[in-house]
A protein has these predicted regions:
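Conserved alpha-helical scaffold segments that buttress catalytic/binding sites
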Residues: 1-194
């Protein structure tokens, strides 16, 4: 599909599912960046003994993809010390907009529009979007596997994505992961579909 100029997307339950697509985009030989919307950094080399897990997807993408120029993480609010060390030692290949930093700047008067401009400015011209639904506030996705207090409203993410499209950057692929409807409600699926 990519050879036909199509934008390929992956809908997965667990966040490790898009690694194959990210590697396929990398195999085209052109630099690209990843916009990761997530509560977690996903930079662990392994999680509970598994090297291919939802907690390792971005670690593996950085390790396997030689054309991945920049990883821009947005909304991260649950991070291990080892992941912070990876971010710090990445020579600016990883730029993380932590949830608490974004919120503190807003409390001090910075607008979401200004923050979105900063986020988009960090991205190269070709962008892959990786959206783990737990990047949203937990009341919007209470049944996801690892909800974390804090996060975004849906309209904030929609604004970010619209502004990314308006910026002239080329979207080369995307994923939406960790959407898990509950036993008594399809609320999470409804939010994920929007």
């Amino acid at each position: 599909l990519m050879d036909q100029g199509k934008i390929v997307g992956v809908l997965g339950g667990e966040h490790s599912t898009p690694l194959g697509l990210i590697e396929a985009i990398d195999s085209k030989g052109e630099n690209f960046g990843i916009l990761q919307i997530d509560a977690h950094a996903d930079l662990r080399d392994a999680y509970e003994g598994f090297e291919q897990s939802h907690a390792s997807i971005m670690f593996n993408a950085l390790k396997n993809c030689k054309n991945l120029a920049r990883l821009v993480q947005v909304g991260i609010r649950d991070v291990a010390e080892s992941e912070i060390e990876i971010i710090k030692s990445s020579d600016n290949q990883i730029h993380t907009f932590f949830d608490w930093d974004l919120k503190e700047a807003q409390y001090n008067g910075q607008t979401w529009a200004t923050q979105v401009d900063e986020i988009i400015h960090m991205l190269p011209q070709r962008v892959y979007i990786s959206f783990d639904i737990d990047g949203l506030s937990p009341e919007l996705c209470p049944n996801t596997g690892t909800p974390v207090v804090g996060g975004f409203k849906l309209e904030e993410i929609n604004y970010l994505l619209f502004k990314l499209a308006e910026s002239g950057r080329k979207i080369v692929g995307f994923d939406l992961n960790e959407v898990a409807p509950g036993n008594n409600s399809d609320w999470d699926a409804n939010v994920g579909a929007r």
